[in-house]
From Swiss-Prot:
The modification N6-acetyllysine is found at residues 18, 100, 106. Has a 10-fold higher specific activity than BPG-independent phosphoglycerate mutase. It comes from Escherichia coli (strain K12). Substrate binds at residues 10-17, 23-24, 62, 89-92, 100, 116-117, 185-186. The lineage of its organism: Bacteria, Pseudomonadati, Pseudomonadota, Gammaproteobacteria, Enterobacterales. This is 2,3-bisphosphoglycerate-dependent phosphoglycerate mutase. GO terms for cellular component: cytoplasm; cytosol.
Length: 250
């Protein structure tokens, strides 16, 4: 049976991950640790014999720079790349820039967990005159006002990620090309929920660690057979637990 593989990588630790702040569409770069995580992901993929024909990422530099570092370690810096806002992190609305633990102290752990992980729960909206509104950013100049979020739930993130998967990424895989996607915790959770047909309760508890390759294997009909992380299982579990704990009051 022919097996097709897809590799997903959540960007390495960003400066705002390090500071435990809600990031969303804010364009913050990788921390030094994040660069190291991205390079380590590339080295691991190389050791495991992976190479690719095409790459996808978001229009946010923490994902773009993660992909650069991964491809550099693979000696595939030349690889064609498509960047799309549809792979951006979920938009966190008026929470963007706020410290997660301080927000939990103010509103309670459960409210922040729902804002972070609730399927249809949206954080408080931005206003259009807020400097954080994406309509002020030239990279989104071609988007309609309807496409520009003031906030997003995971459900709304799915509404943009999955059509992009079905219309753009999957056809390329079906043509025989080997694909890697470097994106974000919630855009990747959106894809995992769809591919694995997860319930809203199951996806609530899924935390994707930074800078760890996540491999999907598909059958000849492009139905997922299994998914697994590359690397040390204990280290990966610890990183995922750390992601889960970010939204708790100290």
């Amino acid at each position: 049976m022919a097996v097709t593989k897809l590799v997903l990588v959540r960007h390495g630790e960003s400066q705002w991950n390090k500071e435990n702040r809600f990031t969303g569409w804010y364009d913050v770069d990788l921390s030094e640790k994040g660069v190291s995580e991205a390079k380590a992901a590339g080295k691991l993929l190389k050791e495991e014999g992976y190479s690719f024909d095409f790459a996808y990422t978001s229009v946010l530099k923490r994902a773009i720079h993660t992909l650069w570092n991964v491809l550099d370690e693979l000696d595939q810096a030349w690889l064609p790349v498509e960047k799309s806002w549809k792979l951006n992190e979920r938009h966190y609305g008026a929470l963007q820039g706020l410290n997660k633990a301080e927000t939990a102290e103010k509103y309670g752990d459960e409210q922040v967990k729902q804002w972070r992980r609730g399927f249809a729960v949206t954080p408080p909206e931005l206003t259009k005159d807020d400097e954080r509104y994406p309509g002020h950013d030239p990279r989104y100049a071609k988007l309609s006002e309807k496409e520009l979020p003031l906030t997003e739930s995971l459900a709304l993130t799915i509404d943009r990620v999955i059509p992009y998967w079905n219309e753009t990424i999957l056809p390329r895989m079906k043509s025989g090309e080997r694909v890697i996607i470097a994106a974000h915790g919630n855009s990747l959770r959106a894809l995992v929920k769809y591919l694995d047909n997860m319930s809203e309760e199951e996806i609530l508890e899924l935390n994707i660690p930074t800078g760890v390759p996540l491999v999907y294997e598909f059958d000849e009909n492009f139905k997922p057979l299994k998914r697994y992380y590359l690397g040390n299982a204990d280290e990966i579990a610890a990183k995922a637990a750390a992601v889960a704990n970010q939204g708790k009051a100290k």
